[in-house]
């Protein structure tokens, strides 16, 4: 009997040891927030199809083991709605989690209020209730500037720790500069505007930029336009149709592969467009795309 009890005690201790090793691995949840806009409260914005990206991205994420996916489209993707989604994601996240965030919609350059940009302009995501021009209904508070986004991502990084990963995919365009004139085909849908959101008044003289401790993959370079492909975002279409080929590759190799696809006859549009990779790179995307 004593021998049996010792054996049971030994097995229980062994199981407890195994559980302490296994549980931390199981705790690494794959979480995502996917935002897409094809409608805007202010009808001055051009019609795009960012909302059509969302179901495609969700299917891709589910195929890669993501179990916690929040989506916001059109009227639900207000500034407050997006901020709430960020805060909820931060509250739910745990050490070591794998995070995917995507924004598909309009982008715009807006007045840099804290002086951290050399050109005096911040990049901003455009929520449903943001206006194209400064007005009484939107004095800039409805835009989601890159400074605000960085604050949420910094909090998220603190929550998941260095062992976690954050990938931010931006299928938008912030510039829409004079190269727009090169696109004479009215059937080409462009995500981006050539109007800066100008906030009157004095700005802070200077401020340091926060460290980007996450990976950002954008649909185009700062000076380029983002053209849609077959009614969805070009970057989104390429990701959902090619991610299986990204498994096990470095972020730079994945970027190179995406850039090469951009140049194929199938995707090459009337104006030049190349993706942009920035921030904390290494093997972030290979952890996102890990199912063969």
What are these regions (language model features)?
Residues 18-292:
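Cysteine endopeptidase catalytic domains of the caspase/legumain-like
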Residues 1-2, 289:
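Short hotspots in intrinsically disordered terminal tails
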Residues 2-12:
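Bacterial N-terminal signal peptides that target proteins for export
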